[in-house]
Design a protein with these regions (language model features):
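Conserved beta-strand hairpin/beta-sheet module of binuclear metal-dependent hydrolase folds
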Residues: 2-52, 144-154
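Residue-level detector of beta-strand face positions
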Residues: 12, 24, 116, 122-124, ...
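Small/polar loops that bind or transfer phosphate-bearing groups
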Residues: 36-37, 85, 127, 194
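Residue-level marker for buried hydrophobic side chains located in beta-strands
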Residues: 34, 58-60, 83, 152, ...
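Active-site HxH/HxHxD metal-binding segment of metal-dependent hydrolases
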Residues: 40-124, 207-211
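Conserved S/T- and glycine-rich ATP-binding loop of Class I adenylate-forming
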Residues: 25, 62, 135
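Metallo-beta-lactamase
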Residues: 98-102, 129-214
Length: 214
């Protein structure tokens, strides 16, 4: 368990091969939960959800890259959860499937989203409210998810680094603008939970992230 406060429990599962962070969000007040970026090992994610005594209501993806979506199809099929992605990432969803099949265990192409994520949308389960923040740059439809004092930053912002922008649909100028105008304006003590690597805070990134110093 990464964090349990204000009635919210956040569990992080690190899946191979890259490694990538999958997050399970749940609340004491609901038997439903949200899974963010299920990038591999659908059975393990389902096992952890069952251990929490929850059912998956939504699968929310920060972006459409295969290392964040490879377990979506099986989870949707076995749990009937609703899958959501920003519409601008439809063009990259399942790109490189043949390569991904070789490197990600039990890779399956992601299904079409049940609904699309949009800027300022609020998604609720129980007493949890998750706000969508569109942060293009790593991909055109990259988003972050804000819940209370935590931001799930996907591959937009990392601990002392930023997402790659040399992949199809990536743009470095757009990425830095997204980070500066959408993320660095958040409270300094906001905890950042990224798609890869360890957690950080907005204030730490303002001070120490080499990409954000000018």
């Amino acid at each position: 368990v990464f964090s349990k406060s204000n009635g919210i429990e956040i569990k992080r599962i690190v899946v191979p091969p890259f490694p990538e962070n999958v997050y399970i969000l749940s609340s004491d007040k609901s038997d439903e939960c949200i899974v963010i970026d299920p990038g591999a090992e659908a059975d393990r994610i389902a096992f952890e959800v069952k251990n929490l005594g929850k059912n998956i209501r939504y699968i929310l993806n920060t972006h459409g890259h295969g290392d964040h979506t490879a377990a979506v199809a099986k989870l949707v099929d076995t749990t009937k959860a609703e899958f959501a992605l920003h519409e601008s990432d439809l063009g990259i969803l399942n790109n490189g499937s043949e390569w991904l099949e070789q490197v990600i265990p039990n890779y399956l192409p992601a299904p079409n989203p049940d609904f699309y994520l949009v800027q300022d949308q609020v998604i609720k389960i129980g007493d949890l409210s998750i706000k969508v923040i569109h942060t293009p740059g790593h991909t055109p439809g990259g988003v972050c998810f804000l819940i209370q004092d935590v931001i799930f930053s996907g591959d937009t912002l990392f601990n002392e680094s930023i997402g790659r922008y040399d992949l199809p649909g990536g743009d470095g100028v757009t990425l830095l603008e997204s980070i500066r105008t959408k993320l660095l304006v958040l409270p300094d003590d906001m905890v950042v939970l990224p798609g890869h690597g360890s957690e950080t805070t907005i204030s730490h990134e303002k001070q120490y992230n080499p990409f954000l110093q000018n």
